[in-house]
Amino acid sequence: MKFVDEVKIHVKAGDGGDGAVAWRREKFIPRGGPAGGDGGNGGDVVLEVDPQLSTLLDYRYIREHKARNGEKGSGSDMNGKDGADLVLRVPPGTVVKDAATGEQLCDLGAAGERVVIAKGGRGGLGNMNFASSTNQAPRYAEDGTPGAERDLVLELKLLADVGIVGYPNAGKSTLISRISRARPKIADYPFTTLTPNLGVVGWRERSFVVADIPGLIEGAHAGAGLGHQFLRHVERCRVLIHLVEGANPEPGRAPRADLDAINAELAAYSDELAKKPQIVAVTKIDVPEARAAGVKLQKLLGRRKKPVPVHLVSAVTGEGLDALLDAVGRALFKEARPHRGGGGKKLAKPRARA
């Protein structure tokens, strides 16, 4: 399935039906009074969270969405039928913005959550409503009001507890495939991951959702590489695992420089991202060169005024993964006591996969 995380759509609620001008036409009542019914109300446009969805693909090619109009009133005091609501289903984590102003209208997260995003027009009153002692035969009725319409931007921000960030080819996809049942595409070249992947990780008697965020590069906050389209998914994460490639980085790159560069991109995108708790891990330590680079980074960051722990991990051999997951779990659940059991166990099924 293609992953689509931002779309622009136009929604139009149904118009209210017009009220009717009609008269009683019954035997033995030659001058029957007004009997025009009211018009029906127009249908609303409603957004509803569907937990089975993980992308906005359905709205990529269908941009116009209109609810039903209310029916007109008729004689014999009969009101028009209300127009049916139009329910648009969206995945959890959908943020809705007004396309013209950029104002955030709602943030939809809970399964089944509903919000009326465009209100249907009100049905007009029939002439029977305007009869009075001074005007017993009104020859007019009220028109229905038009339904609301607006342009919307739908943005999907993944609902994950933990985000895995780092340069392309840092080993993010391999890591998530080891600690969960997610099975992302893995290859030894940059930008293999073009869509975020979600996996559920079991830790002690709890679980949390991890997102493998596609690789970031310098300038990502301004749209370079895969751009800030994926940085938005990090915003909801409570904790970040920052992976640093220890083995064979590109010429001119080093683990410390990679770490600082990605942190600079997070800070440039949002102050809130820069403040999120991070667990730093050097990957691929099954390669001697990477292990040596990891030990060096441990010493560098350990000498800071506020020391930063660095985990050395190998997704190939599993070394260091238990300690890494313990650090993540404690950061998420604020548990200070060290875990005396095994590491993160796999659950039977990931929460979602794009």
From Swiss-Prot:
The keyword Hydrolase appears for this protein: yes
E.C. code: 3.6.5.-
Entry-linked Gene3D superfamilies: GTP1/OBG domain, P-loop containing nucleotide triphosphate hydrolases
Residues the entry annotates as binding GTP: 166-173, 191-195, 212-215, 283-286, 314-316
Signal peptide range: none
Cofactor: Mg(2+)
Domain Obg: 1-159
Localization in the cell: Cytoplasm
PROSITE patterns: G_OBG, GTP1_OBG, OBG
Leading EC class: hydrolase
Chief location category: cytoplasm
Positions of the OBG-type G domain: 160-333
Keywords annotated in UniProt: Cytoplasm, GTP-binding, Hydrolase, Magnesium, Metal-binding, Nucleotide-binding
Molecular function terms from GO: GTP binding; GTPase activity; magnesium ion binding
GO biological process: ribosome biogenesis
Keyword GTP-binding: yes
Binding site for Mg(2+): S173, T193
Any one GO cellular component localisation term in the record: cytoplasm
Protein family per UniProt: Belongs to the TRAFAC class OBG-HflX-like GTPase superfamily. OBG GTPase family.
Subunit structure: Monomer.
PANTHER family: DEVELOPMENTALLY REGULATED GTP-BINDING PROTEIN-RELATED, MITOCHONDRIAL RIBOSOME-ASSOCIATED GTPASE 2
Function of the protein: An essential GTPase which binds GTP, GDP and possibly (p)ppGpp with moderate affinity, with high nucleotide exchange rates and a fairly low GTP hydrolysis rate. Plays a role in control of the cell cycle, stress response, ribosome biogenesis and in those bacteria that undergo differentiation, in morphogenesis control.
NCBIfam families per the UniProt record, alphabetical: Obg_CgtA, PRK12296.1, PRK12297.1, PRK12299.1
Name of the featured protein: GTPase Obg
Organism: Anaeromyxobacter sp. (strain K)
Protein encoded by which gene: obg
